[in-house]
Every structure is written in C-alpha cells, then in structure tokens.
Amino acid sequence: MALLQIAEPGQSSAPHEHRIAIGIDLGTTHSLVATVLSGQSKVLQDEKGRVLFPSIVHYAEQSIEYGDDAKPFITTDPKNSIISVKRFMGRSKADIKFQHPYVLVGNDNEMPAFETAQGRKTPVEISAAILNQLKIRAEESLKNPINGAVITVPAYFDEAQRQATRDAAQLAGLNVLRLLNEPTAAAIAYGLDQENQLSSDRNYVIYDLGGGTFDVSILRFSQGVFEVLATGGHTALGGDDLDRLIVKWAKKQLHIESLDDHEYAAFLVAARTAKEQLSEQQSVYFKALDHKLELNRDTFESIIQIALDKTISVCKRVLRDAKLSLDEIEKVVLVGGSTRSYAVQNVVRQVFNQEPLCTINPDEVVAIGASITANQLIGNSQDGSLLLDVTPLSLGLETMGGLVERLISRNTAIPVARRQEFTTYQDGQSAMLIHVVQGERDLVEHCRSLGRFVLHGIPPMTAGQARIEVTFQVDADGLLTVSAQETTSGVKAQIDIKPSYGLSATDTERLLLEGFQHAEEDKNLRHLQETKVEAQRELEALEQALKNDAGLLDIQQLQALHTAKDQLQQQLQSNDIDQIERAVAQLKIHSDEFAALRMNQHIDHALKGTKLEDWSDSQK
C-alpha cells in the first residue's frame, strides 16, 4: 500500500530526500535495532560487532551500565541489575507473581517501581534507557539523526502495556511511527506478501517464542493485504521460563531447598547457557557455582514439557479461532531465540505436520520486519502490503442490568471504529455513565473494567427519546479511544483508555477460557437480565402513570392492576424467567386497559373546545 505524503506547510521535503527510520525489537532478554540501506534491511552492530543488545540496566551508586556492560552485575549485584523489564511493563505490583530479586515499591494496584542504588526507577524509565541506547547505536552507525521508529510489541500486549511502551519511547526521544505486533513484523521480514502473487489466499502461522512472551498468529495474505485472522499467547511465557524450569530441576537434583539472590542469579545464567548449547549438542553440563550436572536433550524436553504443552494448547485454540485446518496452513515461521531449541522445533513439527521456516536468524527477524515497515511509513518506499492486526479481546460497554454490549469483537482487524446508538433509561435523565469493559462474557462482573467517564448535559427528555452515539476507536497501535455524543445538543465526552496496569497472563487466559466455557450459561443469563430490565422499565412507567391518572380506574380495576404489579415485583426477586414472563404478560392485560383509558382522556382533552366544522376544515 503506497502511503500518501502530507508535509507541514512550508516544510515540504525534497522529492528524493532519504529520511532515516529504524525498526526496534524491544525484547525481554535482548533488543535489536535495524534500518533499510540501499533497499536492504540491516541489523545494526555496536563497535564490537555485536547485534544483540542485552535488555539489562545496572544502577550503581555513581554510574549506570547498559547491555553487555551490565551483564556481569547480574550475579554480583542482582538487586540493582534489572533484567526482563518487559515483563513488568503496564502491570500492577499485585500482578507480578513470578520470582525476581528486586525490591518493588508502590501500591498493589499500580505499576511498581524498582528500588535501586540510584533511587526508584519505573519499568517505563528502564525501558526508555534501553531504547535510548539503541537510538544512540543507530545514530552512531548511520551518522545521522533518527527521524522515526517502529517498535515491536507482543501481539497479546493489552492497552496498558502498549501505552507503557509508547511512553518509554517518548521518554527516549523517539518519534514513534507505529507499534507493530512482533508476528506481523516477522511476516514482513520473510516477504510472505511477495510469494506467488497470482495464487489464491495463503495462510501462515507465526510461532514466536521469545525471552519472556509467547505469541501465535495466523496471517492471511489476500489481494495485497495481510490480515491477522487470529492470535493468542501468553504475556509471561518464554525463554526466561524455560530457564526457571531448568533451575527448578537442578535444585531438585542437587537437593537444594532454596537459593539466595546471588545463587539464584548464578543458576539462571547456567540454565540459559546449557539451554543454548543444547541447540547444537546432544548433551551438555549445567555448571553453577561449584555444582555440575549432565543435561541431555531428552531430559531437557521433559523438564520444559509443561511450558511446551501451554504453547500447544494455544496453537490449537488459534487454529480453531481462525476456523482453519492444518492442511490450509501454507507455512509456519519460527521467531524468537527460544525457537532455536531442538525441543521447541520438534513440538512445532508435531503440531503443524510440516518443517518450520527458520532461514532468517530468529533473533533478528522481528527487527528486520520493523525496519521495513519504518522505511515505508517514513516515506522512503512506495511499496508494501497493508497489515491488519487484530484486537485480542472483545471491547464493549455496560448497559442496564449489568450486561455487556460488545462494540468490537475479539479478533477484529485494526485500526477499526464502531458506532452504536444508546438511549436514556429514566425520564429527565441528564447524564450517562459510560463504563468500558474488555472480555468475552455477557455480564460486566465477569469482564475486566478498562475505564469510566460521564456524559453530562443531556437535554431532559422522556426515557428512550435521547440518542447517544457511542464510538469505539482502536488505532493501529491497539490503543482505544471511546467517545459519546448526544445527537440533538452536540454535547460530547471521551476517554483514552490507558489503564494503570495490564492483564496478567493468567487473567488473559482466564478471560478467554471462561468465555468459551460459559457461552450457553451467559446466553441464558443475558436473556434473564434483559427480561428483568424490560420488566422493571414497565413497572416504573406504570408507577408514574398511576401517580398521574389513577382516578381513571374503578376500585376493582385499580386493585387488579396493583395485584399484577406486586406479583411481577415478587417474581423479579427470583431467577425463574418463565414465571417472570408470565407475570409480565398478566400485568400487560391490565396495563393495556389502563393505557387505553389514558389515551382516550388525552384525545378528549385535545379535542375539547374544538368545533366539528373546525375539525372538518383541518382535514381539507
């Protein structure tokens, strides 16, 4: 898709000016930066020829070390050596349940800060420090300032995690052209859009097992457009977790009950080394401090089986979501350093019945794809395919009765906007609370609250007459804006969804699974709640009518109406929908009679004092 260029007035670029854009893979364990030079994507090196930048920051009292310079301090000063900060991004202190050596401060429901030798540092600040180092590497390598950057994030990052990433980039002084899902970046890097242009639709699986996150996406390429059909994963499953499983095995083999922070850090380093060596060798040694254990591929596979099983279940679920069979998958692409593992590759072969594609360095493929996208977005390339990412969970708002009205369904391609009209519940209602939720259930109490705002200034009207247009808009970065406008007066309010913390991996999995498991139950509950809300509305309208016109009824009529009303109110305390519907029908018999009397009275009042010839003349 060629992008139209719109320059600032008086600031138009020269027609052949090349602007510098970079792609950044902000990884859990390693980060990379790449750019496009002379039409070719290139991963940028440091002065020692290294492309991988360890995502580590060490805070000493008088200095700060980054990347490889910070690595030695993981074992000697673990509390001040922040690794895998990506796992903390956009998450609350209460969400962080995995083992770590850090002192975290802050309230449980807020994003924490790390207590370091240089004071408190938030995950956003630490990520910004890593991004700044990558920016410096790019500027030194390219001898030019950077005009823009595309930064990749896991496909399963929610709004809070994406916003935290944007905040970190802004703090690092980067102009963010776009946040790009990592699997989508891999598809671009492999040029899957360039294959067999005349063939029919093609489906690809991107299996991305990085240092701290796992994502599986199914992409369809059709008529020049990439669309993510389905995506799934874990925000806390990756190479770090495989390392922890090896440490757990080693502790058991060595009969060690617990490790202090220094020992645990040393065991993690030994686990990572052994894991990487097993990609090339059948058997290696786990060496930590004065301990030494033999570890072969079979044992390693059994150790990490629990993690592999999780990836298998996600793969199967994503295939179901996409409504595809294995025969309909063209290729499987491996992404992330953890996919070098023989055990991981073997699982992929078994699940998809084909040899996975891994001709591009799995550590570099995401950065390469990000650089290609950055080159397109900055205006250097007129070629490219439109990439449509998807929303990982459904988005909606709360309606009367605690029900969820979905405006954007899970796996909807983004960017996307959806509008829907709502109305008031009570006469004279002048404000409306908009409660935005995320999840797959039909009741608000089972979904995740994203935010609330109030639309004030609704003109007083009879219930049901006001028209409130609510718009949900998700941009290309997956960030949500919700607005509400009353159509007659034009009053408007909106909220940008930037939750104070994100979903834990467990919560994300729970929201999806509960949506599947309780689908029938939720359908029945929705029907029950909708019936109750409608019945309550009828009762309130009837109550108001009786205040105004009860004199139209004789004693028997009034008594029968009150009896039917009381019976319905009593049934509303139960969850028996059949009894409620019968009570509604019984009340309707008497309320319809009352409504007819009221209508006749209003007609009489309207015609009172009007002559027959006046009425006849008005009809001519």
Curated annotation (Swiss-Prot):
Biological-process GO terms, alphabetical: iron-sulfur cluster assembly
The organism's place on the tree of life at top rank: Bacteria
A Pfam cross-reference name: HSP70
Disulfide bonds: none
PROSITE patterns named among the record's database cross-references: HSP70_1, HSP70_2
InterPro entries xref list: ATPase_NBD, Heat_shock_70_CS, HscA_NBD, HSP70_C_sf, HSP70_peptide-bd_sf, Hsp_70_fam, ISC_FeS_clus_asmbl_HscA
Function: Chaperone involved in the maturation of iron-sulfur cluster-containing proteins. Has a low intrinsic ATPase activity which is markedly stimulated by HscB.
HAMAP family assigned to the protein according to its UniProt record, in alphabetical order: HscA
Sequence similarity: Belongs to the heat shock protein 70 family.
Name of this protein: Chaperone protein HscA homolog
Organism: Acinetobacter baylyi (strain ATCC 33305 / BD413 / ADP1)
